[in-house]
């Protein structure tokens, strides 16, 4: 009964936010394919334009190019020390950049073979890193590994595989308490979930959500554990996978991140445009 009451409370909270009154604001447009939106505790936003090989930065002074020749940067995330961790899809590696701009390669090979094309990334508060390794577009012709992967990098830098998949994974995120790992399936249009232990090890996956409209890309959680999936719209689900509502968009979403000082602005990337929406909900702490 208590769990039903909690679900009803969460659903009522989201329902109170009338979708017809939500304002979707266009922030930046005329890009080629945006992805990898990430908010920094230092008060700025990063996002990738993958085919244009750039990472953009938006802060209090406006927008500028943060990095040229980004290696086909796709997913971005900041660790607890403020360092930027990036999935470089064209370079087929995961890197970490410190405040001085020094770049360190965290992963580029598994079992002696190059990664496919790292795509999206999530970082737990204790330093455990998780990323997806599909092979979209031209990367499919360069695929060396005999599977599509979900990978884990420990704080000591050790790389292991979480899941060997036949279909391509896409977005990835953590629950607010860091005990659950969520992965979207681009081909199957599902969300998988893995239990994580204190050492960062994952259980076998189970399918939590099916029948997503459009190709599911990035995924995030709010501080109540609700799931926000970038797809044809922004599809919002309860922690147990029940659909709550959708935020309609001018074009399909590729990724998303909670940002601003109160973590109540949802920044959304589509192929060509960066959007933002103010919400009553607040982003989950593991997204930072």
Question: For each of these PLM feature ranges, what is it?
Answer:
Residues 50-51, 89-90, 136-147, 186-189, ...:
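Short, solvent-exposed loop/turn segments at conserved positions within beta-propeller repeat blades
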Residues 3-12:
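Sec-dependent N-terminal signal peptides
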Residues 23, 28-45, 69-88, 93, ...:
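Beta-rich, blade/repeat-based domains predominating
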Residues 54-56, 93-95, 148-151, 190-192, ...:
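A short loop-to-beta-strand structural motif that recurs across blades of beta-propeller domains
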């Amino acid at each position: 009964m208590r769990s039903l009451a909690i679900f009803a409370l969460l659903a009522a909270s989201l329902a109170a936010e009338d979708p017809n009154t939500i304002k979707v604001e266009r922030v930046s447009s005329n890009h080629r394919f945006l992805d990898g939106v990430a908010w920094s505790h230092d008060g700025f936003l990063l996002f990738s334009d993958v085919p244009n090989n750039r990472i953009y930065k938006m802060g209090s002074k406006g927008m500028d190019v943060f990095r040229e020749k980004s290696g086909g940067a796709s997913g971005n995330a900041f660790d607890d020390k403020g360092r930027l961790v990036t999935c470089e899809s064209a370079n087929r590696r995961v890197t970490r950049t410190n405040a001085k701009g020094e770049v360190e390669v965290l992963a580029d090979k598994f079992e002696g073979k190059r990664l496919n094309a790292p795509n999206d990334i999530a970082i737990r508060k204790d330093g455990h890193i998780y990323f997806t390794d599909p092979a979209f577009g031209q990367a499919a012709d360069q695929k060396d590994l005999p599977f599509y992967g979900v990978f884990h990098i420990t704080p000591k830098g050790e790389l292991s595989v979480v899941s060997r998949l036949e279909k391509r994974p896409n977005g990835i995120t953590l629950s607010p308490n860091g005990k659950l790992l969520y992965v979207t399936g681009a081909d199957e249009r599902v969300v998988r979930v893995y239990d994580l232990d204190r050492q960062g090890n994952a259980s076998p996956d189970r399918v939590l959500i099916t029948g997503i409209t459009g190709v599911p890309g990035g995924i995030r959680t709010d501080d109540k554990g609700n799931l926000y999936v970038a797809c044809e719209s922004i599809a919002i689900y309860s922690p147990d996978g029940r659909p709550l509502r959708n935020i309609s968009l001018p074009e399909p979403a590729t990724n998303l991140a909670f940002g601003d000082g109160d973590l109540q602005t949802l920044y959304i990337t589509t192929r060509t445009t960066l959007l933002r929406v103010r919400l009553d909900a607040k982003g989950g702490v593991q997204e930072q």
